[in-house]
């Protein structure tokens, strides 16, 4: 029996038969007005879901797969004739003591719907509609005619390196795209990778995906055991991208060797092998491929290759004329907010980001005040900002889009399923346009330079402040001995920054900084305090993203620089 992860896949043999029952298309007028009104809200009655027959206006062709919590059917929209893959998830409506668990399960569905509707990438299967009944959720995806990578490996064995490289590059393109948009997949495995009829990769099943923020760690165990990173088995908190890199390493091993790197008849034995990253190559492959896999399947996350290192690796680029294209749009500072975008997305995602609207407006304020600052770039990587950009990129930033209107009146609160459906409907209300247009000048939210950021606002007006405190120094902070004044402390810090190629930006209360080590970027801030009781200066160095290995180096650079100053 197939698993639910095959949701968009159907082999050629599965396509044969079963077509006659849906061969005639139904005219839209034949669909009852009450149904059409409910469908506008995403709600369908239980009587409009007949198991094995139809869901609203979608007629079943055949079942594709089942799992512990859902099943997937191949369907056809009787109004357009379009084939779709429909993921059917029972709603948990028991109530009582299991209420929190039910809420989390519902939120996971809503998150999958939102993520799958905003991601727009040639190697990611996209959600097209979302419906719900009192007892079920229905996620309608684009239909991908093809085969699972799992089936290809099982039937044909390991792939040749040239073919495997092509598929892996397409997969890396998709993962780079989602990571750039603050999304981590968390369930990468060969069952969730389809090869379509044009021999291209389609990544599916974002049911375990989540948004990640470099400041907030995740702690949920996700994914298949064979592809799960050691830190998941150990119950450690994680940022997100690093577990996708581990899974990518296991996927590449399976592609080139025809089996998984870790296996054992005993579950405890399997877990022990994974946690030790204890594996051998069961097949001879190229030196470059082995080096890449060994760099990805590393037990310690801080020693594991980052995705950018994987993309730039020798094997991935061997024989290629160009680097991998992530299809991520160039992003400009938001100089003008499109109010029509803010409300539908903030309503739909309020279960995870209740302050989304406020954060978007804060980022907008930062964009208008200063162009190309580190603080602006840092904020542009936050999930809520990525969501706003994704919506704008899909809808083209067009102020004339009237799909969502705001008459200024306070609307009654929506139930979450209806708000999520409204957002999906809003996303597909218009053909994809161009990127955001409200731009003052050609400034991209990408890389930064020492020259552009080291002499920004505040250098000549006493900023950043050295704040007075009664507590700093007792419990935390780097003690600065024998420094005479505020200005002397700032001069020492700037000397340390310059000596270690630390890019900095002066803000009101701190230095907002960026440092690179082995192609990894660490964002952090340095704040200065004067302890009134101790009559001494102290610094705090606070990490702003998850590159802990680089941050440890940064902390040592600053603390040793203060100790060894002339």
Swiss-Prot record:
Cell location: Cytoplasm; Cell membrane
Matching SMART domains: S_TKc
Disordered, as annotated region: 1-27
Reactions that this protein is recorded to catalyse: L-seryl-[protein] + ATP = O-phospho-L-seryl-[protein] + ADP + H(+); L-threonyl-[protein] + ATP = O-phospho-L-threonyl-[protein] + ADP + H(+)
UniProt GO MF annotations: ATP binding; protein serine kinase activity; protein serine/threonine kinase activity
Domain Protein kinase: 58-316
PROSITE patterns, sorted: PROTEIN_KINASE_ATP, PROTEIN_KINASE_DOM, PROTEIN_KINASE_ST
Principal subcellular localization: cytoplasm
Enzyme class: transferase
GO BP field: exocytosis; intracellular signal transduction; microtubule cytoskeleton organization
Residue pairs linked by disulfide bridges in the UniProt entry: none
InterPro entries linked: Kinase-like_dom_sf, Prot_kinase_dom, Protein_kinase_ATP_BS, Ser/Thr_kinase_AS
Binding residue positions for ATP: 64-72, 87
Protein keywords: ATP-binding, Cell membrane, Cytoplasm, Exocytosis, Kinase, Membrane, Nucleotide-binding, Serine/threonine-protein kinase, Transferase
Enzyme Commission numbers on file: 2.7.11.1
Catalytic residues (positions): 187
Cellular component annotations (GO), alphabetically ordered: cytoplasm; plasma membrane
Chain intervals with Acidic residues compositional bias: 13-22
Mode of membrane association: Peripheral membrane protein
Gene3D superfamilies: Transferase(Phosphotransferase) domain 1
Family, similarity comment: Belongs to the protein kinase superfamily. CAMK Ser/Thr protein kinase family. NIM1 subfamily.
Function: Serine/threonine protein kinase involved in regulation of exocytosis.
Protein name: Probable serine/threonine-protein kinase KIN1 homolog
Annotated source species: Encephalitozoon cuniculi (strain GB-M1) (Microsporidian parasite)
